[in-house]
Amino acid sequence: MINTIFCATGYGNGAKIVAVEGSFHRGLPSFNISGLANHSIQEAKHRVQSALQSAQIPLPPMRFVLNLSPADLPKSGSHFDLPIALLGAMQKEILQEEWFAFGELGLDGTLKHQEGIFPLLLEIALQRRGAKVILPKGGEEIFSPIPNLTLYFASSLQEALEILKSPPPPIERKGLEFESIEILGEKYYYTQDFDFDFSEVLGQDVAKRVALISACGMHNFILEGSPGCGKSMIAKRMRGILPPMSLEEMIECVKLQALGNQSISYSPLRPFRSPHQSASKSSILGSATSLEAKAGEIALAHRGILFFDELPHFKKDILESLREPLENNCLVISRVHSKIEYETSFLFVGAQNPCPCGNLLSSSKECRCQEREISHYRNKLSEPFWDRIDMFVQMSEKREGSVGLSSREMQEKVFEVFKIQKLRGQKNFNGKLRAKEIAQYCILESECFELIEKMQDKFGLSFRGVQKIKKVARSIADLEGSEKIKKSHLIEAFGYRKI
């Protein structure tokens, strides 16, 4: 007779569901755990035996065999105590339903609250909607808001066993109290609380236009200009105008908050990560060992914005390492005993001065840099890196002019384009479309093909460069409500290309 209770273990910036299988067999009394369980799980034998004894459910004089499946996945965490103990207690009964259980046991059978299981629960909410989960008491305030799960809380092994045999009514949960729009039967959540507003950025109409197009399609862009011209101002205001979030995306972002040791808040605001230029490569990319994986800034920016201020001051190997996540929306870290894959679908924003002193484009200050210094400064960004950037704009030094669109007005335009993309059947934003999707959704008017050939011949555009221009043109066309991409849309998109 074999029973199975499910649990989970951390894996990259997510988690893997683990089936904990248990069975009793005739033979000399023993307690064996297989399936690449680390020391914290192997030590569970002693805690579980003591907890079962305290609950007056001693293990029978038989072989107790446990298998953690998949067997080739390394597993860790004392939260496996509870499912192991429950399987030890279910000696003559067969579970009829699928259950998840998490919790560390004391020797007296009490369950101990663990905040570290929070990201695991969020991953289960994404993978197994409606799953029944038993958790230790003490975490109600943190865990209860998690959607898609039916949660039960127990203070001891005995209580958990009673829940397993006769489930009480689940706890009541409040719904998400955010503004939302509904498209094709699915809700997308947003907020209009703007900590920073685009109305505060005077002038800079071209840069604000680029920011709007970028937000519509999640296009990567770089701003160049003299110190104080408003590069960082624009980057910090991008977060407020990004597309609304689905429930699944919100869960992913809350999970990233937990992985990044941030305070937990359920919010439709997308992540905004801005590492310092002195940050190490492992803090940017993340790290992986056979026992532990730590998400870096790239992974923590998933579904949001990754902002590199003073871009050329970052180490060259870090900048080159961005090429894979910018191209494939994922990052694979391979080590001798481990291989971790992080999802990295983010909007990259870079800001840089035109030269080391910053005054090259200034009309009032003299540049103090030599030619070789400027050349070395600009060569920090390679051609393959630039090829992955959708838009580039040089900002003027003047900070005067009209107020232009506010963040609320820009957000409304972004939402209109977001709705167009969803009604068109797109699963990805315009800026994240794959080659097949570009052919399907980036439909060009007949006069555009000749223009593309001329641009390729004259400027030597790569295939990737042409695809980038098409995707930006798609967002521009959506802003104008045009079903097909027109010549004017391509010309504007090409104007933002770094040649």
Language model features: what each stretch is:
Residues 221-262, 328:
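Walker A/P-loop
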Residues 212-214, 265, 269-271, 279-306:
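Conserved alpha-helical scaffold flanking the Walker A/P-loop in AAA+ ATPase domains
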Residues 223, 308, 351:
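Hydrophobic anchor at the beta1->P-loop junction of P-loop NTPases
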Residues 107, 306, 313-314:
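Residues immediately C-terminal
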Residues 1-222, 229, 483-487, 491-493, ...:
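Peripheral, non-AAA+ core regions of ATP-driven protein-machinery
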Residues 102, 154, 301, 308-311:
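Hydrophobic residues in beta-strands of the RecA-like P-loop NTPase core, especially within AAA+ ATPase
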Residues 34-45, 60, 67-77, 290-293, ...:
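Basic, amphipathic alpha-helical bundle interface domains used for macromolecular binding and assembly
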